[in-house]
């Protein structure tokens, strides 16, 4: 079976090797693209393909990547990395202080990122031993960048989980909840009170669109007639997440392969795999900093699937084309 991080990677590496051989594409430039969990997958595949199949890639593209090495920590760093996403979402819903709201999003986010790295993370690291005046000061700034009430932030000890944010941000602005995968979407629950939305409102819209489309395509365009259900979301359980070394394996693959470059694409309004977590993952792949010129990062005013917004569909595709043109070897020898 391939229900696990490492078994999934091994299975897909074997499949890719067979495909490349059968289609006689060994001399072709090779790129992997993975979205969400696929980000973990392609990080691991880059190393597996090189070391088990001697297949060297030109590029790895991670779209809204999930980094379970980060998610499983549950520490101060993980918590703090949510704030710039909160800022972007609050800006979209006109929930920020007037001084911030009148600015462009791209001008606000560096301020939120700086506060997160240099003030919020150290404050959370101190836990219950933080000075009370410092705690209040951090809460005030957190409120400024998130649109959340200072008292609410203090009641959560400066550590506001994302599900609380989705429920709380618009509680006093119509009692709406906001989406997880795309926080531009609004919904409402039976009760305005509570700590978690009843459902992911964006999925109701997407499932309503994608399910008829894929079923029509399979039956009418591909002429694949079946009574089997197409699972837009599938119960793939249990999934073995043990021994996840994919982030470091990408570093090893890049160290072995001077031509391997990485592009990361993220949506500002994605609350599942938020853009600042993706940026942090990029920073941590190679702590030495010797390969930082081989990383590219692009963000978009969209959610988890940035290509659902027409402007970002065009821009994200153009960014991939530019990345490919920058990462072609053009006959250079593979050496440092």
What is the predicted function of each stretch?
Residues 34-47:
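Glycine-rich nucleophile elbow surrounding the catalytic serine of serine-hydrolase chemistry
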Residues 62, 297-303:
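Short glycine-rich catalytic loops that host catalytic nucleophiles or stabilize transition states
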Residues 127-272:
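Alpha/beta-hydrolase fold catalytic core
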Residues 301-312:
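Catalytic histidine-centered segment of alpha/beta-hydrolase-like enzymes
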């Amino acid at each position: 079976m391939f229900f696990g991080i490492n078994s999934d990677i091994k299975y897909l590496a074997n499949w890719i090797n067979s495909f490349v051989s059968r289609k006689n594409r060994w001399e072709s430039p090779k790129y992997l693209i993975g979205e969400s969990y696929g980000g973990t997958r392609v990080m691991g595949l880059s190393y597996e393909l090189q070391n088990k199949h001697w297949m060297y890639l030109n590029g790895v593209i991670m779209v809204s990547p999930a980094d379970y090495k980060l998610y499983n920590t549950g520490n101060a760093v993980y918590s703090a990395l949510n704030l710039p996403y909160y800022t972007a979402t609050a800006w979209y819903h006109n929930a920020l202080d007037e001084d911030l709201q009148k600015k462009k999003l791209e001008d606000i986010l560096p301020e939120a990122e700086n506060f997160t790295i240099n003030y919020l993370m150290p404050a959370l690291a101190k836990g219950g031993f933080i000075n009370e005046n410092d705690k209040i000061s951090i809460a005030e700034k957190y409120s400024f960048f998130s649109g959340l009430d200072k008292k609410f932030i203090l009641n959560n000890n400066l550590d506001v989980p994302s599900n609380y944010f989705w429920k709380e941000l618009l509680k006093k602005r119509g009692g709406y909840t906001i989406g997880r995968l795309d926080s531009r979407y609004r919904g409402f629950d039976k009760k305005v009170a509570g700590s978690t939305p009843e459902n992911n409102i964006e999925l109701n819209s997407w499932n309503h669109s994608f399910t008829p489309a894929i079923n029509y395509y399979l039956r009418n365009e591909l002429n694949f007639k079946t009574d089997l259900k197409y699972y837009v979301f599938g119960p793939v359980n249990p999934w073995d997440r043990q021994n996840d070394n994919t982030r470091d394996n990408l570093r090893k693959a890049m160290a072995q392969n001077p031509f391997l470059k990485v592009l990361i694409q993220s949506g500002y309004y994605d609350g599942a795999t938020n853009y600042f977590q993706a940026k942090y993952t990029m920073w941590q792949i190679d702590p030495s900093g010797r390969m930082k010129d081989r990383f590219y990062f692009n963000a978009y005013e969209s959610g988890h699937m940035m290509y659902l917004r027409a402007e970002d569909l065009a821009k994200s595709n153009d960014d991939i084309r530019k990345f490919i043109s920058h990462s072609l070897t053009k006959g250079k020898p593979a050496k440092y």
